[in-house]
């Protein structure tokens, strides 16, 4: 029985590699019953050979960033994948210093069919820490904060979340009385509980990676925007706009901005002109 907890991942806070991952943004994905080449193919990655250790992966990604002139908006990146044993057979571990973008949702659904995918990420800078668990093509549980879960079975992992040290009540609510815990370390422990893979610095540094250049993903179509804000006094603002409303307003604003400026001048009356000319 796997009893790993957040304590077993305390090493991440003294690891130069993990510090780099947190600062640059990363995604670590574990995929059951898929080979590294198969995973990179589904991701649409262009093969970039193999490399020993994370240093080669970082160098390859840095070289790609230079190729695109360090374009901030370019979301392509070099990912590394290798095979490692875990629960119920071989798994593929994919690591990318991708700013926390993660593998595209459609790809993960495909990769998890007939198996399991577990992923965690950080976007660096102003950190957003995400966790995802897919099973047989279905997003079962996802969260940023463990007390605000989503997915088709958002509460299924609550017992495991509590066991690895996350501060939750048996009902899955935040437990104010629970001791402080390193949430990121707890998430890595949770991933091990679901995969049987102990991620260590040496595992990542010593692996032989299949490298692939992951292209930018096309933007998803959207149908509207919702603003849902609750202020410190508990006042809530909830309002939504359909795509058509936003498009109409945008077209109107654009037309007004491009319209010619007309300056009108009112001709003074004869009496006003007389007073102006005489100075009366």
Give names to the regions the model predicted.
Residues 5-164:
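Hydrophobic alpha-helical segments that drive targeting, anchoring, or assembly
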Residues 3-14, 133-280:
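Long, compositionally biased intrinsically disordered terminal regions
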């Amino acid at each position: 029985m796997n009893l790993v907890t957040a304590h077993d991942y305390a090493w991440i806070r003294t690891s130069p590699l993990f510090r780099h991952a947190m600062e640059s943004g990363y995604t670590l994905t574990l995929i059951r019953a898929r080979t590294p080449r198969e995973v990179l193919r589904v991701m649409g990655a262009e093969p970039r050979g193999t490399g020993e250790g994370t240093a080669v992966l970082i160098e390859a990604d840095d070289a790609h960033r230079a190729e695109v002139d360090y374009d901030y908006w370019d979301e392509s990146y070099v990912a590394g994948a290798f095979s490692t044993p875990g629960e119920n057979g071989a798994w593929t571990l994919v690591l990318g210093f991708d700013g926390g973008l993660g593998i595209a949702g459609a790809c993960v659904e495909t990769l998890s069919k007939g198996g399991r995918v577990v992923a965690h990420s950080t976007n660096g800078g102003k950190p957003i820490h995400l966790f995802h668990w897919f099973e047989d093509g279905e997003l079962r549980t996802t969260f940023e904060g463990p007390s605000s879960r989503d997915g088709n079975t958002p509460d299924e992992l609550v017992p495991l979340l509590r066991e690895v040290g996350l501060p939750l009540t048996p009902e899955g609510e935040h437990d104010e009385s629970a001791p402080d815990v390193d949430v990121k370390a707890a998430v890595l422990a949770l991933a091990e509980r679901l995969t049987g893979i102990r991620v260590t610095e040496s595992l990542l540094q010593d692996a032989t990676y299949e490298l692939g250049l992951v292209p930018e993903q096309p933007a998803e179509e959207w149908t509207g925007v919702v603003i849902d804000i609750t202020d410190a006094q508990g006042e809530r603002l909830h309002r939504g706009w359909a795509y058509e409303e936003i498009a109409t307003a945008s077209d109107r604003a654009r037309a007004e901005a491009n319209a010619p400026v007309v300056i009108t001048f009112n001709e003074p009356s004869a009496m006003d002109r007389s007073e102006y000319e005489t100075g009366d």
